[in-house]
Curated annotation (Swiss-Prot):
GO terms for biological process: protein targeting to ER; signal peptide processing. Coiled coil: none annotated. This is Signal peptidase complex subunit 2. The chain crosses the membrane at residues 46-66, 73-93. Residues 67-72 are lumenal.
Length: 180
């Protein structure tokens, strides 16, 4: 993994660059550190979406068997419930997920450290903000790196994995040292 490069990204497209860098960070953490990614946030998002779609499907099915005048109340309740579920989903993404793209548990002897990695690139800005947070038995720590995407992407739009890996290793080591 020392001199690997990943697929070319359009360096002028912020969301594409963010997603590409996030994938590189995931790969580094899974390969080097050996963590297993947890998908709890994604599973909850899928559950909320499924409940909303189930309301919609029930409304369609009920309207098929009992046409409109009879199904008015059911259609109303299901429609309102669907939009409530979508509102809950949006609030979940804003306040619980908070741009988190990677969660993992690190087992260190008898104790388990829960890690959450997130990132962001603001619109019309070249700064990539990589944040890491861990929680372990009442203790926690967090850190972040703010760098221009130009530090990780060459002129051809290729993400340089060794440079990203150095930053991820540095952030991880800083957080481990700060805990002790």
């Amino acid at each position: 993994m020392s001199d690997e490069r990943i697929t070319v990204v359009n360096k002028w497209d912020g969301p594409t660059v963010k997603n590409g860098l996030d994938e590189v960070v995931k790969k580094i953490l899974n390969d080097k550190v050996g963590w297993t990614e947890q998908h709890n946030l994604m599973n909850l998002r899928l559950l909320i979406s499924f409940i909303g779609v189930a309301f919609s499907a029930f409304a369609c099915g009920y309207d098929f068997y009992a046409p409109f005048p009879k199904s008015k109340i059911v259609l109303l309740v299901c429609s309102v419930s669907y939009f409530i579920c979508m509102g809950v989903l949006q609030l979940f993404q804003w306040y619980v997920e908070k741009d988190c793209f990677y969660e993992a548990n690190e087992v260190d002897g008898k104790q388990t450290r829960k890690w959450a990695w997130s990132s962001e690139i603001k619109a019309h800005d070249d700064k990539y903000v990589l944040s890491a947070e861990f929680k372990k038995e009442g203790r926690s720590g967090q850190g972040k790196i703010i760098k221009s995407i130009g530090a990780y992407i060459d002129n051809d739009g290729e993400i340089m994995i060794p440079l990203v890996q150095r930053e991820v290793d540095d952030l991880w080591a800083r957080l481990i040292r700060s805990e002790q």
